[in-house]
């Protein structure tokens, strides 16, 4: 393939999504500080971090198209990060119960050869059911979504937390908006469909 693909993420969920393109790719885990800067908006944060993650590939690779992605949950104009433990996950889900939450996913494609990058932000809205304390606790014990923005895994049992999903690409909720990604790759000359002629279908 003319452009090797590199995913700047150790997330198995993002890797699984990228496999839908049926193209070979490498992965690496970018080591970046994900803390928000002073007065940084949620959109600015995910844009900056997706770019930082993609550009970190220059330490490991010399050529290729690097895909960087970052996601935050926004509720009442506040950024909610990963919960890291059950206490914080229960607290987040209790806040979300009966309300809508916006998830912003920053996506960056960075060309290691030219240094050019293209970035976009994909919003997705989730309306939660009214949940009981017992339901929230049972969900957290079952799926332990402590490293996930929003304290859930929508690709698993987390789907049962929702009343409604609104957005252009449900893949963005898992962390990698594939529709936008295919468009950005095409802008760099990599058409995912045309590239299938060199890639056996699995």
UniProtKB/Swiss-Prot annotation:
CDD domains: Maf. It is found in: Cytoplasm. One of its GO terms (biological process) is nucleotide metabolic process. The keyword Cytoplasm applies. Its main location: cytoplasm. It comes from Pseudoalteromonas translucida (strain TAC 125). Disulfide bonds: none annotated. This is 7-methyl-GTP pyrophosphatase. Its cofactor is a divalent metal cation.
């Amino acid at each position: 393939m003319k452009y090797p693909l590199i995913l700047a993420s150790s997330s198995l969920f993002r890797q699984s999504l990228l496999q839908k393109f049926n193209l070979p790719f490498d992965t690496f885990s970018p080591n970046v500080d994900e803390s928000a800067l002073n007065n940084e908006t949620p959109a600015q944060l995910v844009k900056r971090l997706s770019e930082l993650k993609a550009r970190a590939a220059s330490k490991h690779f010399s050529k290729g198209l690097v895909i960087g992605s970052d996601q935050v949950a926004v509720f009442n104009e506040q950024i909610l990060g990963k919960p890291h433990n059950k206490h914080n996950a229960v607290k987040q889900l209790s806040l979300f119960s009966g309300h809508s939450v916006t998830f912003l996913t920053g996506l960056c494609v960075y060309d290691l050869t030219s240094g050019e990058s293209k970035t976009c932000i994909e919003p997705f809205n989730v309306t939660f059911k009214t949940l009981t304390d017992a339901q929230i606790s049972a969900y957290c014990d079952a799926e332990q979504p402590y490293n996930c923005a929003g304290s859930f895994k929508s690709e698993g049992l987390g789907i049962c937390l929702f009343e409604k999903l609104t957005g252009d690409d449900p893949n963005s909720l898992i962390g990698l908006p594939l529709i936008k990604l295919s468009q950005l790759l095409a802008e760099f000359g990599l058409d995912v469909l045309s590239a299938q002629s060199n890639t056996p279908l699995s």
